[in-house]
Amino acid sequence: MDINLFDFHLPEELIAQVPLEERETSRLMVLDRETGDIEHKHFTDILSYLHEGDCLVLNETKVMPARLHGVKEDTGAHIEVLLLKQEEGDKWETLVKPAKRVKEGTVISFGEGKLKATCTGTADQGGRQLEFSYDGIFYEILDELGEMPLPPYIKETLEDRDRYQTVYAKEIGSAAAPTAGLHFTEELLEKLKQKGVELAFITLHVGLGTFRPVSADTIEEHHMHAEYYHMSEETAALLNRVKENGGRIITVGTTSTRTLETIATDHNGKLCAASGWTDIFMYPGYEFKAIDGLITNFHLPKSTLIMLVSAFANRDNVLHAYNEAVKEKYRFFSFGDAMFIASHAKMGNK
């Protein structure tokens, strides 16, 4: 399948550069995955579309301030490091700039020596393996010295670091935020609970591969990046109970979707406690096994994320919805507006 089938025209001014002042004031496009019907709403209207007995699945990963600026100990040359994946102990897979200056044995110093890293080898796609040394607690030092690794299409400086975290972020380890969750406030989540909507939490640590463009000409040639996920016994039991009682499982974001669909694929359609690495790639033709609805932002043209959404809601429906979003001047990407996709015609509003 040609990746150009997932292209659409997006004016640059529709790429949201900063978050809205209030999280929940974003717009919400409601798309019926079967009929293609569209409604234009605000995010707080999600209360009308979720019903007692439904379950929202939220990714409680927390974004690391994963971008570090340091100097080579021998020459003083500036080096930028982006943490991608913790391998074991203090060893990390990273991207470094300029990569040609960092060879095996190179020592990089951050924060006047508060944190040091030694290059122990190369990694995939031009990356470097670094081993860190420090006194104290690594994540506390990282919190002091690191910067949030905003996506490459965001050019503005983020004034409030917390705006690139969900209000329920808990498990540190992501190089990017699960952005569909950024629209929720604690008050909105409380209102959903009062309505009888269940909240279930999983963890999937988002890697920077989520921003990598598809370089192959056809979908089938593309290989997905792997990301670590975890679902507890408590969450699995809740999801199975919701299913048994006829409720819907609504994932917040493509990361929650990838987690549930990975587990269901690996366990004959069942949801159970599991941890591991997933490189699942969902595109048209994929049959969903776990979810009934999806809340997600508007994604990049020709990205694996728009392919996932097209697998769930039909490519023609999705591209029509995206063209409508452009026409109606919705905000796109990480700090942009949201979609809620499900079989709405069957449910109606309550």
Curated annotation (Swiss-Prot):
Self-association or partners: how does it assemble?
Monomer.
Database matches in InterPro entries: QueA, QueA_dom1, QueA_dom2, QueA_sf
Query: Under which name does UniProt file this protein?
Result: S-adenosylmethionine:tRNA ribosyltransferase-isomerase
Q: Which reaction does it catalyse?
A: 7-aminomethyl-7-carbaguanosine(34) in tRNA + S-adenosyl-L-methionine = epoxyqueuosine(34) in tRNA + adenine + L-methionine + 2 H(+)
Which GO-annotated molecular functions does the record name? S-adenosylmethionine:tRNA ribosyltransferase-isomerase activity
State the compartments where it is located: Cytoplasm
Which biological processes are named by the entry's GO terms?
queuosine biosynthetic process; tRNA wobble guanine modification
The pathway this protein participates in, as annotated, is: tRNA modification; tRNA-queuosine biosynthesis
